[in-house]
UniProtKB/Swiss-Prot annotation:
InterPro entries: 6-hairpin_glycosidase_sf, 6hp_glycosidase-like_sf, Glyco_hydro_8, Glyco_hydro_8_CS. The lineage of its organism: Bacteria, Bacillati, Actinomycetota, Actinomycetes, Micrococcales. This is Endoglucanase. Residues 1-23 form the signal peptide. It catalyses: Endohydrolysis of (1->4)-beta-D-glucosidic linkages in cellulose, lichenin and cereal beta-D-glucans. It comes from Cellulomonas uda. Belongs to the glycosyl hydrolase 8 (cellulase D) family. SUPFAM superfamilies: Six-hairpin glycosidases (SSF48208). Coiled coil: none annotated. The biological conversion of cellulose to glucose generally requires three types of hydrolytic enzymes: (1) Endoglucanases which cut internal beta-1,4-glucosidic bonds; (2) Exocellobiohydrolases that cut the disaccharide cellobiose from the non-reducing end of the cellulose polymer chain; (3) Beta-1,4-glucosidases which hydrolyze the cellobiose and other short cello-oligosaccharides to glucose. The active site is at E53 (proton donor), D110 (nucleophile). It comes from the Bacteria.
Amino acid sequence: MPLRALVAVIVTTAVMLVPRAWAQTAWERYKARFMMPDARIIDTANGNVSHTEGQGFAMLLAVANNDRPAFDKLWQWTDSTLRDKSNGLFYWRYNPVAPDPIADKNNATDGDTLIAWALLRAQKQWQDKRYATASDAITASLLKYTVVTFAGRQVMLPGVKGFNRNDHLNLNPSYFIFPAWRAFAERTHLTAWRTLQSDGQALLGQMGWGKSHLPSDWVALRADGKMLPAKEWPPRMSFDAIRIPLYISWVDPHSALLAPWKAWMQSYPRLQTPAWINVSTNEVAPWNMAGGLLAVRDLTLGEPLERRRLTTRMIITPPASSCWSGWRNRISASAVMALQVSQPVCLRAERKEQERLTM
C-alpha cells in the first residue's frame, strides 16, 4: 500500500485564553481564507482538497465563536457530501477536480471524532437535540466499525480499512483525542469510551524510542503487546505526533505522560527546538519549530501567555524538497479548538495532512 505525496498549508496562532473580540476577528479571517461559500474547508496548498479533519476543526471553531449559521453550513456540506451511508462515518478526503472527488472510500477516525465532538458541543451551545442525535449516531458507528480489542487493549483504528494487518495493527496515537472521548463517555455512559481513554493512555506510556523517548507518528502494535514505529512511515515524531501532548494537556495538564515531551522540549532553546525527530536514528529536522508547533510546545511546558502571544500570526511556508527528505509545508489548514473553564483556548496547530494508506 503506497504512501502518497504530502502537501498542506501552515496556519498558526498562539495557544492562549483569547478575548472574545480577538477570537471573533480571527474566526472571520479564518472563514474568509479557508471556508468556501458552500462551507467546504480547503487545503490551499494541496489543490484545494478538503478533509474531514478540517471540517471537524472548523465546526468546533464555529461553536466556540457562537456562529450557528456557519456551523450549520459546515455540517450540511459535510453530512451531504462526505457521509458514507454504508457505515455512518465520513469519507476522509474530497478532491473537487478529480473525476471521482471521493476516490478513496475510507474514513479517518480523527475527522469522524472531531465532527461528532463538534455536534455534541453544538447541542450544549444552542440546545438543539438534533445535533446530539447526529453525534450519537457517529459515535455508535465509531464503536461498531473502528474500535477493536487487540493485544489485550481496546483501541480505535485510524480507519475502517487497511490498518489491521492480522499480526499487528497500525495505529496513529495522535488520533487518540482524549477530550472528545471523555465527552462521549459523559454523554453515553458507555464504558467503551472510558476504556479507550485508559487503554490509550496506557499504550502511550509504553510508546517511546531513541534518546527522546517519544512516540512516532505511526506505531505498530503487535499481537504480543510490543510496539515499534510502523514500517510504512518514516519513524518520526513530527506533525502528527505533536498533537499528542496537546490532547493530553486538554485532559490533564499535569499528566505524567507529558514528562518525555517536556524533557525533550526543554533540552533545546525555545526557538531552536527541532520541528521533528527521527526516534530510530535521533536525527532532527534541519529547521525549527515555529507558529503552531511552538504553541504546542509552550502549552506543554506551561509557558506564560505573553510568550505565546508573540507567536500569534499567519504563516505560509514554501515547499523545500521532496516529501521524503522533508517538506516544510506539510501542514493542514485545519484549526483545533478547545474550551477550558468556559473560555476559548484556540490553536491553529501546524501539522501535515498525511496522505493515507489505501487498500
